[in-house]
C-alpha cells in the first residue's frame, strides 16, 4: 500500500471522477436563492443554458438575456460599444453555484477605466450531472454560447472580436467549443482558461478541448496538475498561446494534503472537496487578484520546466519570454504554446519578486561540503534578514551555483548583501578537526570556502548587478561567519574617487 499522501491523492481522484472534481457549490446557496431573482427561482422544465448580464459591481440579481429576443438587450443594459466578458463555471456536484462568480463579476465591473459588459453562462442544469455526462454536455453548451454570439452579431452588430470568455475547469473547454463552433474566418477575441479540467481532456486532440485555435488569443492558468495514476484535476499539457504554471502548477502554497485526515475528522468528506477546491480554484483567485491589484501584477517567465526555473535560469524578458498573469496580459500570438512559470504567495496579493543569485565558491577543503547558508538583503526600500539558502548539492572545488530567491516585498534596488555560513554542532566539530590537522602541516595551508563574486538578476526589473566582498583582504568564509558584499560598480567608483582625492591632496602638499 502507498504512503498516506498517495492514498489521499488516490481518494481525491476517486471523488473527482464520481462526484466533486471541481469543488463547485461548497457552502453556497442554489442559484435562485443566492441571486434572489424571480426568473432564476423558477424550476427548469429541462436542462438548458441560460445567459445573465450584470448591471454593476453590486448586482446579484442579474438580467436574463434571451437569444432571438432583442428587447432583452435593452432591458439588461447591454452596451454594444463595450467589450463583452462572459464567465463560464465548471462542473457541479450539488447544483449550486460558487461565490467566486460574484467576486469576479464585482472585480470586472469595478474597473471604471475599462467599462465592460459582464455576463454569466449558467449551465448548472447540464453541469449537475455525472462527470462523464457533464463532459459530454460541454460541447452542447459551447454551441449555445456560439449561437448567442452569432445572434449578437446579427441583432446588435456586435463583433465577436470584442468577446472574452473566462472559463473555469470544465468551463474552459466550454469556451473552447464555443470558439470552434463559430462560423466564418473571424474568431472570438480572447479565451482565458482557469485550471482547465484534466480528466477526459488530457492528451486529446485540439478539437476535443480548449486550444490556441479557438480564439485570437488564448491564455491559461494551471494550478492543480499533480498527477496520480495518470490523472490530474487540472490539465497539465499546454493548451494556449501562454500557459502559466504558478508554483510549477502541480499544487499551491496554503493547500495542504497532509492535513486532509484532520479535516475529514472535522468536516467529513467535504474536507476532500475543500482540499481539491483550494488548489483548483486558486486559478480563479489569481485572476481576480490581477483585477483587484493592478499595481501588483504577477509576472511569469518562459521556461522548460520547474527545475530549471527553481535555479533562477529563466528570468529573461527578451523576445516576449515573460508576460503578465491575468486580465492585463500582453496579447502576443505565437505559433507554439509558451510555458511560463512563477512563484506566488499563499494569499492575496499573490505577487512575489523573483531574483536569480549566482555565487562562485572555491572549496579549499578536500571533500565536498554541504553547509547551511542564510543571506540578508538590503535594498533602497526594505531589508530582508536571514533568507535560508539551499544549493541542492554539495560544494566541490571551484564551481558557480545558481538558485532562485523570491521576496514578498519590494525592497527596491539591491545595495548590500550579507552572506552567512550558519553553524551547527556537526560542522563546528568538522571544522575544528580540520584546523587542528592543518596546524601539524609542514607548509602553511589555507582552508575554507572562498566567496569571490555574487551575481544578481532581478526578474521584475531585469536589472543585473554584481557584488564583491567588502573586505578583499579576507575572502574566506568559516562556520558562523558572515561576509558583507557590496555592489562592485559602487565599490569601484568609491575607490576611484578615493584615489583621486588622495592624488589631489598629494599635489596640494607639493
Swiss-Prot record:
* Protein's UniProt keywords contain Secreted: yes
Signal peptide interval: 1-21
Q: Name the catalytic site residues.
A: 169, 195, 280
A GO molecular function for this record? triacylglycerol lipase activity
| UniProt KW keywords | Glycoprotein, HDL, Heparin-binding, Hydrolase, Lipid degradation, Lipid metabolism, Secreted, Signal
Annotated PLAT domain ranges read 353-487
Question: What EC number(s) does the entry state?
Answer: 3.1.1.3, 3.1.1.5, 3.1.1.32
Q: What protein family does this chain belong to?
A: Belongs to the AB hydrolase superfamily. Lipase family.
Please explain the role this protein plays, according to its UniProt record: Catalyzes the hydrolysis of triglycerides and phospholipids present in circulating plasma lipoproteins, including chylomicrons, intermediate density lipoproteins (IDL), low density lipoproteins (LDL) of large size and high density lipoproteins (HDL), releasing free fatty acids (FFA) and smaller lipoprotein particles. Also exhibits lysophospholipase activity. Can hydrolyze both neutral lipid and phospholipid substrates but shows a greater binding affinity for neutral lipid substrates than phospholipid substrates.
Q: How does it assemble?
A: Homodimer.
Protein name in the entry: Hepatic triacylglycerol lipase
Name the source organism.
Mus musculus
Name the gene: Lipc
Amino acid at each position: 500500500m502507498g504512503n498516506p499522501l498517495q492514498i489521499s491523492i488516490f481518494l481525491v481522484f476517486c471523488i473527482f471522477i464520481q462526484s466533486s472534481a471541481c469543488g463547485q457549490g461548497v457552502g453556497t446557496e442554489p442559484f435562485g436563492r443566492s441571486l434572489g431573482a424571480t426568473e432564476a427561482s423558477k424550476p427548469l422544465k429541462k436542462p438548458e443554458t441560460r445567459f445573465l448580464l450584470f448591471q454593476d459591481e453590486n448586482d446579484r440579481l442579474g438580467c436574463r438575456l434571451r437569444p432571438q429576443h432583442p428587447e432583452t438587450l435593452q432591458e439588461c443594459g447591454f452596451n454594444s460599444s463595450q467589450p463583452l466578458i462572459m464567465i463560464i463555471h465548471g462542473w457541479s456536484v450539488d447544483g449550486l453555484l460558487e461565490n467566486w462568480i460574484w467576486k469576479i463579476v464585482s472585480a470586472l465591473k469595478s474597473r471604471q477605466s475599462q467599462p465592460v459588459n459582464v455576463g454569466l453562462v449558467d449551465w448548472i442544469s447540464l453541469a449537475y450531472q455525472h462527470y462523464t455526462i457533464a463532459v459530454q454536455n460541454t460541447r452542447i453548451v459551447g454551441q449555445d454560447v456560439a449561437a448567442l454570439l452569432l445572434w449578437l452579431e446579427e441583432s446588435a452588430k456586435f463583433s465577436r472580436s470584442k468577446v472574452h470568455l473566462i472559463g473555469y475547469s470544465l468551463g474552459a473547454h466550454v469556451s473552447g467549443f464555443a470558439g470552434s463552433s463559430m462560423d466564418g474566418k473571424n474568431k472570438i477575441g480572447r479565451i482565458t482558461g482557469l485550471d482547465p479540467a484534466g480528466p477526459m481532456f488530457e492528451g486529446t486532440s485540439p478539437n476535443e478541448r480548449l486550444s490556441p485555435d479557438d480564439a485570437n488569443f488564448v491564455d491559461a492558468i494551471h494550478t492543480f496538475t499533480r498527477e496520480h495514476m495518470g490523472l490530474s484535476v487540472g490539465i497539465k499539457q499546454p493548451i494556449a498561446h501562454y500557459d502559466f504554471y504558478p508554483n510549477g502548477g502541480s499544487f499551491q502554497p496554503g493547500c495542504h494534503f497532509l492535513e486532509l485526515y484532520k479535516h475529514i475528522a472535522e468536516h467529513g468528506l467535504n474536507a476532500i472537496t475543500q482540499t481539491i477546491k483550494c488548489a483548483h480554484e486558486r486559478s480563479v483567485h489569481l485572476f481576480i487578484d490581477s483585477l483587484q491589484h493592478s499595481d501588483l501584477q504577477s509576472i511569469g517567465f518562459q521556461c522548460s520546466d520547474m527545475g530549471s526555473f527553481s535555479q533562477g535560469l529563466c528570468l529573461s524578458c527578451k523576445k516576449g519570454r515573460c508576460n503578465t498573469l491575468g486580465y492585463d496580459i500582453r496579447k502576443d500570438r505565437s505559433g507554439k504554446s509558451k510555458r511560463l512559470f512563477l512563484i506566488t504567495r499563499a494569499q492575496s496579493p499573490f505577487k512575489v519578486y523573483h531574483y536569480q543569485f549566482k555565487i562562485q565558491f572555491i572549496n579549499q577543503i578536500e571533500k565536498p561540503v554541504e553547509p547551511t547558508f542564510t543571506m540578508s538583503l538590503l535594498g533602497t526600500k526594505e531589508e530582508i534578514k536571514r533568507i535560508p539558502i539551499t544549493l541542492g548539492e554539495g560544494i566541490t572545488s571551484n564551481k558557480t551555483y545558481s538558485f532562485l530567491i523570491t521576496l514578498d516585498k519590494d525592497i527596491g534596488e539591491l545595495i548590500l548583501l550579507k552572506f552567512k555560513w550558519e553553524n551547527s554542532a556537526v560542522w563546528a566539530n568538522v571544522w575544528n578537526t580540520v584546523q587542528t590537522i592543518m596546524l601539524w602541516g609542514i607548509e602553511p595551508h589555507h582552508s575554507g570556502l572562498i566567496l569571490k563574486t555574487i551575481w544578481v538578476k532581478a526578474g521584475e526589473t531585469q536589472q543585473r548587478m554584481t557584488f564583491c566582498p567588502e573586505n578583499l583582504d579576507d575572502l574566506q568564509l568559516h562556520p558562523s561567519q558572515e561576509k558583507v558584499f557590496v555592489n562592485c560598480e559602487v565599490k569601484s567608483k568609491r575607490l576611484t574617487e578615493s584615489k583621486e582625492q588622495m592624488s589631489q591632496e598629494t599635489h596640494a602638499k607639493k
